[in-house]
């Protein structure tokens, strides 16, 4: 079966670097493919002997809206073989990279560099929702290679994508399950814990005091295990589970991390925290 990776994301986040990594591990890479040609390329690929392809889609200001729609259509039409990788990095990291390379951001124009970065994030929000997100902040080439290798490990293997999010920032657009954790005890109201997130030990200690949290995690695990087993038997390549709390910082992150650790005993699991830094 063919495997198509669409590499997209924020300017300066490392798309070209990721393309080189993918090329090194056996992918045929096409850089800067115009989104309008995606469908034509898939038609050509259907009669080709090439099995693993990475398409780096370079999205410029005049094409943003059409590009997002073109990639969404591609995913809808070829969901069994297409995965979108969305590369991002912190604002501080992006500012540093642009300063180092002395390249202009494609949206800069009349905007400052910081404004251009913020504008691009907003324009690509829908793209990010349908993608597997890779944060390249602070990653050297060797660590990035390991991260991508881990992501692509056992390519034919069924994957569970677990995403934490905050309801206040909107529902995820592309998901199979939405799990609401807003009824659980909230560490936000403890001033010492408010600025931490669900991966911090202090938050772990907080939730360990409430049996209802562990009960909820165990019941949710049983539900997801049943669903994942069925999805896998039906030939589905992945299952996406979105776990939400009010702001996406404490409860949803903690539950997502706990569930991923349990599910990893039986499935390949990929975790991302959409709103943890907002």
Curated annotation (Swiss-Prot):
Looking up InterPro entries in the UniProt record yields:
P-loop_NTPase (IPR027417), RapZ-like (IPR005337), RapZ-like_N (IPR053930), RapZ_C (IPR053931)
Entry-linked Pfam families: PapZ_C, RapZ-like_N
In which organism is this protein found? Pseudothermotoga lettingae (strain ATCC BAA-301 / DSM 14385 / NBRC 107922 / TMO)
Write down what this protein is called.
Nucleotide-binding protein Tlet_0523
Family to which the UniProt record says this protein belongs: Belongs to the RapZ-like family.
Q: Which HAMAP family match?
A: RapZ_like
Query: Which residues does ATP bind?
Result: 9-16
What GO molecular function annotation could you give as one example from this UniProt entry?
GTP binding
Q: Which Gene3D superfamilies match?
A: P-loop containing nucleotide triphosphate hydrolases
Sites where the protein binds GTP: 58-61
Residues folding into a coiled coil are none
